[in-house]
Regions:
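Conserved N-terminal catalytic/coupling substructures associated with nucleotide/phosphate chemistry
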Residues: 1-138
C-alpha cells in the first residue's frame, strides 16, 4: 500500500470488510476474524490503529507481529490460500495490514470449532445452520 492508499483505508469506518486492531488480539479472536472474512466477502485488518477512535498507535515490532499472525493462521485456521501481509510506514510509525480474500472453498473453520464464523457489520458471528441442515445432522 502507498501512504495515500493507507490514508484512504484508515479514513474508513470499521465494517463488514474492515477491522482495526490497536494490538494483537488473542489467537482465538484473530482466527475467528480471519475465517469470518474468508467466509463472507473478504476483508482487511489493520494492526496499529485503535478501533472506534481510529487513533494511530503503530506496531512496535512489525516482523514479530507478522510471525505471530502467520503462526495463528497456520495453527488455528483451515485456509487454502494465505492472506496478504504488508508492512506500511505512515506518520513515522509502522503498521501491519492483512488482506483476506473471499474464500472459494467455504466454509472455513477455526481449529476445534464446529461452526464457521461470518462477518456481520463490524463483528464476527457464529454462522447458524438452517433448521433442515441441523435436522439432517449437517
Amino acid at each position: 500500500l502507498t501512504p495515500e492508499e493507507f490514508e484512504q483505508l484508515i479514513d474508513q469506518r470499521e465494517g463488514e470488510t474492515l477491522d482495526f486492531k490497536r494490538e494483537m488480539p488473542s489467537s482465538s479472536d484473530l482466527a475467528k476474524l480471519i475465517t469470518a472474512f474468508y467466509n463472507t466477502h473478504g476483508g482487511t485488518i489493520v494492526f496499529g490503529v485503535e478501533n472506534g477512535t481510529r487513533r494511530l498507535a503503530g506496531v512496535p515490532s512489525p516482523q514479530g507481529a507478522e510471525t505471530g499472525i502467520v503462526n495463528i493462521i497456520r495453527d488455528r485456521c483451515s485456509l487454502d490460500v494465505m492472506p496478504t501481509i504488508e508492512f506500511v510506514s505512515y506518520g513515522g510509525m509502522q503498521f501491519v495490514v492483512v488482506t483476506c480474500p473471499q474464500g472459494a472453498r467455504k466454509p472455513y473453520l477455526v481449529s476445534g470449532e464446529t461452526r464457521p464464523y461470518i462477518r456481520v457489520g463490524s463483528s464476527n458471528r457464529e454462522a447458524r445452520l438452517s433448521r433442515g441442515a441441523e435436522e439432517r445432522g449437517s
